[in-house]
């Protein structure tokens, strides 16, 4: 019988449709996992409003607002033992809340094509959180890099014909936890499944 993990924090109600959830059996095959920072709904709405202003948008806008995030670590195939160790390591994560401010829109060339991203101000708090989560991933036996971190939030895929405009104003949100996400590409439609939320200080 498959072993079950302890139940993680409950997902935000506004995201339930996209983040099915948590008490899932131990996987038989490696899974596509990443840690990330998700903006709250009001910040997602502001990001979506900004991209709606850009000329040359594709017919369908991906990602949808609820799936927008800033990735900390990403691994394409994590087996069950490493996943369990990563979950255990992330349980020890603690950090003070801090603010992310998205200030600039840029076009980047990715393996899947041109994407539009929003880039945040560089802050010591975000850099420290990336280092801390990378160290926890390495403790779990995963090859996380500490250097070369380029924080960004992907706002639009298939942006080859899109012309960006400066943001009307910076977009801010307060970071309170780190999410561990399983990107389930086999689901129809593909889903993000939240495996846990980490880093909240005790009240």
Q: At which residue positions do the language-model features occur?
A:
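Histidine-dependent nucleotide/RNA phosphoesterase domain, centered on the 2H-phosphoesterase fold
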Residues: 2-203
